[in-house]
Amino acid sequence: MRVYNCHFCSSPVYPGKGIMFVRNDSKEFRFCRSKCHKNFKMKRNPRKLRWTKAFRKAAGKEMVVDSTLAFSARRDVPVRYNRDLVEKTLEAMEKVEEIRLKRERAFYKNRMRGNKAAQLEEDRKLVEAHPELLREREVELRRMQEAGEDDDDEDMSEMEVSEEEESEEEREKVEIALKSKSKRKMRA
């Protein structure tokens, strides 16, 4: 029993799951779900459907050329069982997986590097097109500050009375609460 890859979307097909289609020339096609099978029967190109791995690779969203990807290739050569070999293989598999994940993260960061500048540019255009949005936000912030100052004055007077009766541990809790309130005000 082995885990196959879907012929259409390249996701894993576990034993007992999915659909297997055998063509007249005895070529096997395995599909993870009926969605992939139906798209295959409709002769759709997986590279044009955004949800497939083929699209992601063709569009440059996933790594295509990397030495770690070669380790997942199928090998049909039978090897005599050797405990040491199995142990080393399992260790190597873990290391290869770690390396692959690091490289994928680096690839993703590299791909997303220019997005922040593009997003800022979009935001600038939005503000230029609709300056009234900023004015509305300023009014909301002023209202929140005014409402927040009134509530804080009442809270402070209540806390001063209760602090005289509390022990040192409870005083620390109150101070932490006050700090968090002031941080919230600063954020708003």
Curated annotation (Swiss-Prot):
Residues 147-169 have a biased composition (Acidic residues). InterPro entries: L24e/L24_sf, Ribosomal_eL24, Ribosomal_eL24-rel_N, Ribosomal_eL24_CS, TRASH_dom. One of its GO terms (molecular function) is structural constituent of ribosome. It is found in: Cytoplasm; Nucleus. Residues 140-188 are annotated as: Disordered. Associated with nucleolar and cytoplasmic pre-60S particles. At the end of biogenesis it dissociates from cytoplasmic pre-60S particles and is likely to be exchanged for its ribosomal homolog, RPL24. Belongs to the eukaryotic ribosomal protein eL24 family. This is Ribosome biogenesis protein RLP24.
